[in-house]
Amino acid sequence: MSEEKIVNTEAAPEAVAERPARAERSERPERPAKGPFGKKRFESRRKVCKLCAEKIENVDYKNFQFIKSFTMDSGKILSRRITGTCAKHQRQIASAVKRDRNLAILPYSLPKK
């Protein structure tokens, strides 16, 4: 014995009430140029990739003084957000740092003092 659900397809469509129009939003006042303590707000400049600016196509692992400028004192690689390099050159810098570490030109990490 199978139970079948009977669906009433001839139900009368209910009257759909229209929604009232949305109230107009008031415009926000413009923010002042000064911060909360009266100081001027800090606007950071957009960082530009050094390598793109100097039109360097490939990062050379032999130029370890240049590559060392993209690492912290502890030996970690600095992020793109800090250095301002583009994605292409950040990948090249990372591989050059890893190659220099492998060749013992750069340290993996410096001991804590």
From Swiss-Prot:
Gene3D superfamilies: Ribosomal protein S18. SUPFAM superfamilies: Ribosomal protein S18. InterPro entries: Ribosomal_bS18, Ribosomal_bS18_sf. Residues 1-41 are annotated as: Disordered. The keyword Lipid biosynthesis does not apply. The keyword Ribonucleoprotein applies. HAMAP family: Ribosomal_bS18 (MF_00270). This is Small ribosomal subunit protein bS18. The gene is rpsR.
